Amino acid sequence: MLETCRPMDIEARSFEIITELLGDRKLDPENAPVIKRAIHTTADFDYADNLVFSPHAVQTGLEALRAGCDIVTDTQMAKAGINKTILASLGGEVHCFMSDPDVAAEAKSRGVTRAWVSMEKAAQLKKPCIFAIGNAPTALVSLDALMAAELLRPALLIGVPVGFVNVVESKELIIEGGRAPYIVARGRKGGSNVAAAICNAMLYQIRR
């Protein structure tokens, strides 16, 4: 039987259902809004298990957003999915350099991916940034190299690329390196929609 629900109540009801289906699972209160938003976006309850957080990662992200940090993504899809109205009200904006002609030319000349070079370009930004990576493992590898060389210190690193080639390994590189606060989806799952959802979970906490 179909459930009657007013349009403005659908999202709230969805989160009620998510909470019900999680049952007696104990989620860290700081991380729960991010986990539930990822589940809401994907209808995949595996995120209750595979999202891992460095200590106080969400709080660190919230503080950075309140201070007006920018967000860097590795896809236009993730950029499109982030709530730019809230972000702009806090003084931030979203960047994606993947389609920039100079990035494409540099990547071709060096024989590396555009994702790799786009992270190098992002490292030149003057503002603190949250990096939301939902597609390219090489973006994570590039970020790790930049951090190791002390050329970059992300305010928060969201590592949720999806796929098969170097996906698991690149995520573990971020976790094991511990060079920046992180939220990582262990395993092969993730995606640009999940990267955007994690950003939005924090933005909505600020503007709820």
Give the location of each predicted region.
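Charged, compositionally biased N-terminal leader segments and the immediate start
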Residues: 1-29
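N-terminal glycine-rich anion-binding loops that anchor highly charged ligand groups
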Residues: 26-40
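A short, well-structured juxtamembrane/interface segment
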Residues: 49-64
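Buried hydrophobic positions in well-ordered alpha/beta secondary-structure cores of metabolic enzymes
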Residues: 74, 157-159, 198
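Short glycine/serine/threonine-rich phosphate/pyrophosphate-binding segments
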Residues: 78-81, 138-143, 164-168, 191-195
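Long, charge-dense
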Residues: 87-125
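C-terminal functional extensions of proteins
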Residues: 165-208
